[in-house]
Amino acid sequence: MGIQQITNMCSHLQNASRARLGLTSLPNTKYNLALALALHRAGFISSITRGGPHPPTPEALMTYEPEPVTSANVATRRLWVGLKYWNEEPVLKELKPISKPSRLVTASLEQLNRVARGFPAGYMKGLQLGECLFVNTDRGVLEVREAVERKVGGLVLCKVK
């Protein structure tokens, strides 16, 4: 997995959330899409749409049909991510990458189980209320509780508050 892409995505989404943006764009890569879908399943972001360099209109977000990706337009394709807010506060407050290009952090099932229950394991602190930890497994990007439920370990990507 492109760890540098994941750290850039974490930084970009955190900055967009702090700037109170409703819609932001990311490069359309399979790693960014996998993490964005996991964040959407966890309820941190409201929508994900593939598109071009210009954002789709808010009314067309639900019925928007993006043009297919070809070798001629692959460099201009973007993921348009809708951010969520609750009582004037961003739902996505902090996105902290755990694995870095200089240090890849992998976790076994036992370590993930400890972290999910709130205890530290290795480089990872235990999860507190309202936090999620995302793990890249052979079954895709999963939240740590899903990974424990499916009994798989993997590369720890980021912690979200």
Curated annotation (Swiss-Prot):
One MF annotation (Gene Ontology) recorded for this entry: structural constituent of ribosome
Q: Name one GO biological process term.
A: translation
- Does Mitochondrion count among this protein's keywords? yes
Q: Where does it mainly reside?
A: mitochondrion
- Organism superkingdom: Eukaryota
Keyword Isomerase recorded: no
CC terms in the record's Gene Ontology section: mitochondrial small ribosomal subunit; mitochondrion
Query: Which InterPro entries does UniProt cross-reference here?
Result: Ribosomal_uS8 (IPR000630), Ribosomal_uS8_sf (IPR035987)
The listed locations are: Mitochondrion
Ordered alphabetically, the record's keywords are: Mitochondrion, Ribonucleoprotein, Ribosomal protein
User: What does the UniProt record say this protein does?
Assistant: Component of the mitochondrial ribosome (mitoribosome), a dedicated translation machinery responsible for the synthesis of mitochondrial genome-encoded proteins, including at least some of the essential transmembrane subunits of the mitochondrial respiratory chain. The mitoribosomes are attached to the mitochondrial inner membrane and translation products are cotranslationally integrated into the membrane.
* Quaternary structure and partners: Component of the mitochondrial small ribosomal subunit (mt-SSU). Mature N.crassa 74S mitochondrial ribosomes consist of a small (37S) and a large (54S) subunit. The 37S small subunit contains a 16S ribosomal RNA (16S mt-rRNA) and 32 different proteins. The 54S large subunit contains a 23S rRNA (23S mt-rRNA) and 42 different proteins.
Homology family = Belongs to the universal ribosomal protein uS8 family.
Query: What protein name is recorded for this chain?
Result: Small ribosomal subunit protein uS8m
The organism's lineage is: Eukaryota, Fungi, Dikarya, Ascomycota, Pezizomycotina
Supply the gene name.
mrps8
